[in-house]
Every structure is written in C-alpha cells, then in structure tokens.
Amino acid sequence: MGSDRARKGGGGPKDFGAGLKYNSRHEKVNGLEEGVEFLPVNNVKKVEKHGPGRWVVLAAVLIGLLLVLLGIGFLVWHLQYRDVRVQKVFNGYMRITNENFVDAYENSNSTEFVSLASKVKDALKLLYSGVPFLGPYHKESAVTAFSEGSVIAYYWSEFSIPQHLVEEAERVMAEERVVMLPPRARSLKSFVVTSVVAFPTDSKTVQRTQDNSCSFGLHARGVELMRFTTPGFPDSPYPAHARCQWALRGDADSVLSLTFRSFDLASCDERGSDLVTVYNTLSPMEPHALVQLCGTYPPSYNLTFHSSQNVLLITLITNTERRHPGFEATFFQLPRMSSCGGRLRKAQGTFNSPYYPGHYPPNIDCTWNIEVPNNQHVKVRFKFFYLLEPGVPAGTCPKDYVEINGEKYCGERSQFVVTSNSNKITVRFHSDQSYTDTGFLAEYLSYDSSDPCPGQFTCRTGRCIRKELRCDGWADCTDHSDELNCSCDAGHQFTCKNKFCKPLFWVCDSVNDCGDNSDEQGCSCPAQTFRCSNGKCLSKSQQCNGKDDCGDGSDEASCPKVNVVTCTKHTYRCLNGLCLSKGNPECDGKEDCSDGSDEKDCDCGLRSFTRQARVVGGTDADEGEWPWQVSLHALGQGHICGASLISPNWLVSAAHCYIDDRGFRYSDPTQWTAFLGLHDQSQRSAPGVQERRLKRIISHPFFNDFTFDYDIALLELEKPAEYSSMVRPICLPDASHVFPAGKAIWVTGWGHTQYGGTGALILQKGEIRVINQTTCENLLPQQITPRMMCVGFLSGGVDSCQGDSGGPLSSVEADGRIFQAGVVSWGDGCAQRNKPGVYTRLPLFRDWIKENTGV
C-alpha cells in the first residue's frame, strides 16, 4: 500500500493481515527506534615515531584506563537502567460490527467464547505491531468478557517497556486512546473492527482478574429482582487483600437498575481503604466509573444507579484487615429509554432527571420545551438539585449540567428559580460518560409578570416566600432580598450598619452575623486584653495561666501548650490527680495526661454511618444520624419526652418529664417504655429498634418544678441496650468542658411536648447556636440560673424545629466526636426564630451523673 504522503516515524497507513487498517500518528524519539544506541568506541591516534617520555606513556595509560572504566560504567548503566523493563497494562474494549451476540459469549469456557477471544487477541496483536513504542514490547492480551453492540469485546493488554521509553509509550497510548478504524477494515477473513478504546490500569488488577475465586456473573431474568452480596454477608466480614467482581447483564435493549440495600465497608479515611466501584462497562475502566464507595451508609441513603446499556461491573478491592460485613445489593432490568425530555404545555407541572431520585444514567441528553398560555410568563423552580462530580469545580460545569437561557447549572444547590420573560422556556440536561448523581426535581409554573407571587413576597431570584418572613432577620431568599430596606424590631432585633436586621441574641457572640461585623463592634476589650466569652475583659497575661480568671473557663480554653497547673473547677483533672491547662482535652485523639486517662472510655459520640443523606432546607434527620436519641413513651399516651443514651444501662433526660400530673404517675418507671434506634414513630417494630422498660428514675434532688432549675434526670434501663449501627452512646463532657458562645450545636426530637401536640413522625434536627450568657440573662430577666444555657435557632432555611423535653444537645468536638452539651428544658425545644430556648448545662452535673451511674 504505497503512499506519497510524507510520514513521521513511519506513521502512514499500515496493512495488517487481510485488510485490518490502523493509522499510526506517532513520531520517533531522536530518530531512534526501539531504543537502540551504540557504545562509544576508542579512536586511538598513531604515536609519533620518536618514543614517548615516561610521563607521556603514563598519561596515555591512565587515559586509556579511564576510557575503559567509562565504557564499563556506560555498559553497566545500559544493562541496569536502559534494559530495565516496566510492566504497563491497559484495559479497554473493541467493537466488532459483523458479529452477532449469542448467549454462549457470556460463558468464558464455551467454544464460541474461546474462538472469538482468539480472533480479538490476534487483532490486538496486529494493531500494536504497527504502533511505535508499543508493538515491540507487547507481551500478551486477554479477553475478559463480551456484550451486545453488535459485539463488544472487553480486554486487557500487558506490555514490558524499557524504562527510558515508558513516558513516550504512555503518551502514545494516551493519544491513541480512541482508535477509529475505517468501516471497511478487515482482518482474519471477515472480522470487522470499527473502534478500539483503551485506558491505563493497575497491573495488579490484571493479576487479580486471572483469579476467578471471587468473580461472579449474573443475568437479569424478566422483571425479577436479583440479589447478591459480598462473601459471608452479613454474618462474617468480607475477605481482606482480595479483589471481587460481579458482572451484571440484562437482555438486549434493556438497562440495569442497581441498588445497594446495605453498605458497610472500612472507613474512607484509612490509607488504602477498601473500595467498591461501579462501572458502566464490563471492564474496570476509570473513565466509565459511575461511583466509588467506601465507609458506611444508612439504609435511607440513595445508592441506586442506572446503566446506559445492558451491563454493569461492580468491583470490590480490599486492603484492610478491618472486620466489616460488606454490602447487599439488588438489580433488575428495565426497557431502555426511547427518548428523554419532551414538550410540556400545561399551566404548571413537574419534571425530573431520568430515574430520579435514583442516580441518572451516563451519556444522556434530555430537552424539555415548556410553553404556558400566551398571556403568562413561565418560571422553573428546582426543588432538589444534585449534579456533583468528584474533583470538578461547580462553577465551570464541564461535565454534567442543566442549561437554561444559555446558562449552565451544576454541583449541589439549594432551591433556586429560573425565570423567562416570555411564555416559553427550554431546559436541557446533559450527562457525560462517568460519575453520575441524584439529578434534579423541578416544577414549572405560569405567572403574571405584574404579580409573580400573589399574597407572598417575591425574591429578586423569582422565588416566593411567606410575607411574614420579610424583615425577620433571616435570609430566606438566597439573594437576601427579603432582608433589604427593613425597619428592625428594637425589642428583638439588632440593626446592622448595612441595614440588615439580626436577632439580639447574636450580638457579641464572636460571630460576624451582619456581614460587616457591626454586631461584634463595641464588644471588644482594650488593647493588650483578652475578652472572655461572658464579655469580661482580662489582661492577656491572665490567659492560659491555668486559672479560670474569666469565670467561664474561656481564658483557659484552646491554649496551644499543655501544662500541668494548679487544679481548679475549670481545669481538667487526670486520673493521676494532675490538672491540665488545655481546655476540653477529653477524647480528642491526643494523650495529654501522662497516664493517658483523657483518652480512656472514649467509645462514644461516633456515628456508625460515615455518610449522611443530603437534605437541602429540611429538618428530617437521617437514619442512624443521632444513634443516642431515645424516645420515651408513657403508658397509653405515646411519645412524651426524649432522652440520650450514655451507657448500655443509663439514659439522661429532663426531670420535669417525670412530675406526676393529671392523675398519671409519671414518676413511676413502670409506666414508661424507651425506644432506642427509633427513626419513625410509626415504625417502632422496625429492624434495629430496641424496646426497653425503665427500672429506675433518678431526678436531681434540687430540681425546682417552678423555675426548672436543676432540670435533669437519670433513667436506668431494665435490660441493657445492645450497641449497633442505630444505637450508640453520646460522650459526656468533663465538668471543665466549655461550649463557648457562638458555637453551633444540634438539637433533635420528634417535636412532641408533654401537654399536647401531635409531633412529627420522623426524627427532626435543628442547628442552634450557644448564646452569650449575659445576653441570655438580658433577654429572659430573672429566669436564668447558672445551671441553664440559652441557644438560638441557626438554620434560616427552615421555619422552626420543635425538639423534645429531655432530648440532647449534640456538639461536634475535636476528633469528630459528639458530646452532650445540654438537655432540652424549657422554652421552645428547638427554639423559634428570634426566641431563645433554655437548656440544662450538662458539664455542671458530670460529678452527679458519675456518682449515681458510675459512667
């Protein structure tokens, strides 16, 4: 096949066999092929006729010896470096257009599989033979699977490349990653190959794929739900230092839906952690990975994925010796989508990404053309929006995106609205070949441009909110337009210099809430002084001196150097009797006490599930998110109060829950039932929920049922709780532990009070902030005692969240552990906007708890 076209590196069309053609575009390196170089040769000049002097002879001998040594060194370098071979492996697939897929191709031991695999290996060998820096170093290829389309062959190829050519070989394969061959290309009789795709992979993967001891193949049957698990699930852990894979198939013209029902692997933050990867092919090619998973997930987490064709590959690579049960998964086949998008012509309606709330498939494009009546305008409100891809900045949207009015949207976003200045709007959705997400749920609405939000306030973004949310100090509009040009309520709000209104209890809490820091101005102490959390000013020399000069311990918190100091009620005391200058040292992952006692008894405050579901603007807690939360039911009355689990035998609650009232003996432990691991009040018999009766109720002897001072109680269980993924204890803080003003903490409960209210079925959560004690006393004069703390509601995106009396305040501390800061006492349990709630300070009762429980 001659050609007059100039070629670089012999890169013109080459003829392989009976017509399979491959167009190489690669260049030689320095004009050398196959890395051949020559050793230097001595060029000895003839000596002059007159004999050399002794020194000349000696110099010649030395020079000759030096040249010999250089030659030997070069030879050693050549043998030890240039001839060192590096193993490189690529995996990929080849599309064969003149073959029809038969069922026998699913069995790697069938005659049909072996025959076609042999042809594929021959074709690969021919292709590589014409590629510089690859062909001479090709060792072997293996075919691992076939699938429809017409026939797709999945393979890996191994090369042994001289070390000095590795970089060039990788460049060559990177450039030729997608090889498009002429449609008429033929080799080996009528074997037609139209494309070859290859990607680099780990050589260990190839070695492991040759071991079929943990390799499984499953084919969907009709509409049946198929199940598979890791070896030994759930009674024994999956194998360590292993590679398992599951090749899933469906019928032609179908796609697969895969769901992980239970998922428990070693933590993601461990080096070389165990990893599950789902691929949209039958070969483990990174660019076709849909998701990578590690750690543990609650049952409610969305782990449903969809293929774009009739195959999926799931791999599990384990490196750790940790004992985890692994996963349980199901899959089924469903018809391939014939179209995506469409025309929407009603006045309002909804639409969503394919298979929402499951993950959308890769390689899909959808277009919705929306048209409302002529005299109206149209807007699209995205209620949920998750188009996030690992390592991809959300602002650029180079991969998956939604496009409206020429603007692309991607990443993870809270509710937002896009409007049109006409009665038409077009929404486009695109996903690429890798890493999918949940997608979106949207609604479109027609509106009158002169009154876009009848009876409501219109944000500049087009979103509608209730009128009473206007100028309440909370930014309900994402652009803060509901808080502009407001007149602040002097009794409840602070006027920022930028004219924003903020709750009074956020003033001087060391957090810049106004945005211009005006709520923190006038709170500072003079130069060379330190401002305590309670507002008191001290000389800087008194900070970190081992003494509680502030009175609230804030001058001794977060000191950089840990010193042994004189013991006070505000210093941490080790078991050996020594006290530390460091604030809150317990269970922070560092041994500060010389006897290590600050890191003992730390099996608490950690969730079993390392991943939590994503909820934007909601208050529903996830399953297992607060495993120490307890629901207390009074006989014949249902849920009444909350509590927290601190050990297998003991709960902490509020004393006011156990005051006899209306002829009912709330102080009688036999009248109560505790539900541990509960998430939904209507599912008290669900798996993972533990039901326990109470053996004893110990209310604090100083509890005052009029002022609610000393509002704390201890509850002993009749039968110990069993720790599980849904039931875990919370950490108790030391008596010296400080939860400073401005710190964000969480309150949880089902929103029920002792005297009424239906409450929520699903466990609720609310983020709150510790309020400066002086501010708290000013807001609630003559009502606050030193045993009480105030908090204010923090999450502006949610209207309110009612916690339960007796429930815990959960604070995330050092090392990610969660400590109980307080107990829900009185006021609004989760706090209302601009209204603080009051809670019992738990650190002040640490000694009392230990005296009565031993915990």
Curated annotation (Swiss-Prot):
Reaction catalysed by this enzyme: Cleaves various synthetic substrates with Arg or Lys at the P1 position and prefers small side-chain amino acids, such as Ala and Gly, at the P2 position
The record's Gene Ontology cellular component field reads: basolateral plasma membrane; external side of plasma membrane; extracellular space; plasma membrane
**At which residues is glycosylation annotated?**
109, 302, 485, 772
Give TM regions.
Answer: 56-76
Pfam families xref list: CUB, Ldl_recept_a, SEA, Trypsin
Q: What is its EC number?
A: 3.4.21.109
Q: Where is this region: Disordered?
A: 1-20
GO BP terms in the entry? epithelial cell morphogenesis involved in placental branching; keratinocyte differentiation; neural tube closure; protein catabolic process; proteolysis
Which residue spans belong to the Extracellular compartment?
A: 77-855
Instruction: List residues in topological domain: Cytoplasmic.
Output: 1-55
Q: Which InterPro entries match?
A: CUB_dom (IPR000859), LDL_receptor-like_sf (IPR036055), LDLR_class-A_CS (IPR023415), LDrepeatLR_classA_rpt (IPR002172), Peptidase_S1_PA (IPR009003), Peptidase_S1_PA_chymotrypsin (IPR043504), Peptidase_S1A_matripase (IPR017051), SEA_dom (IPR000082)
Domain annotation CUB: ranges: 214-334, 340-447
Protein keywords: Disease variant, Disulfide bond, Glycoprotein, Hydrolase, Hypotrichosis, Ichthyosis, Membrane, Protease, Repeat, Serine protease, Signal-anchor, Transmembrane, Transmembrane helix
Give the disulfide map.
214-244, 340-366, 397-410, 453-464, 459-477, 471-486, 488-501, 496-514, 508-523, 525-537, 532-550, 544-559, 567-579, 574-593, 587-602, 641-657, 776-790, 801-830
The protein's matches in PROSITE patterns, at most eight in alphabetical order, are given as: CUB, LDLRA_1, LDLRA_2, SEA, TRYPSIN_DOM, TRYPSIN_HIS, TRYPSIN_SER
What Gene Ontology terms describe what this protein does at the molecular function level?
serine-type endopeptidase activity; serine-type peptidase activity
Which locations, inside or outside the cell, does it occupy?
A: Membrane
Identify which residues the record assigns to the active site. 656, 711, 805
Function, as annotated, reads: Exhibits trypsin-like activity as defined by cleavage of synthetic substrates with Arg or Lys as the P1 site. Involved in the terminal differentiation of keratinocytes through prostasin (PRSS8) activation and filaggrin (FLG) processing. Proteolytically cleaves and therefore activates TMPRSS13.
Q: Which disease is it linked to?
A: Ichthyosis, congenital, autosomal recessive 11: A form of autosomal recessive congenital ichthyosis, a disorder of keratinization with abnormal differentiation and desquamation of the epidermis, resulting in abnormal skin scaling over the whole body. The main skin phenotypes are lamellar ichthyosis (LI) and non-bullous congenital ichthyosiform erythroderma (NCIE), although phenotypic overlap within the same patient or among patients from the same family can occur.
Q: How does it assemble?
A: Interacts with CDCP1. May interact with TMEFF1. Interacts with iripin-3, a serine protease inhibitor from Ixodes ricinus saliva. Interacts with iripin-1, a serine protease inhibitor from Ixodes ricinus saliva.
Q: Which family does it belong to?
A: Belongs to the peptidase S1 family.
Q: Can you say what this protein is called?
A: Suppressor of tumorigenicity 14 protein
What is the species listed in this Swiss-Prot or TrEMBL entry?
Homo sapiens (Human)
Instruction: Name the encoding gene, please.
Output: ST14
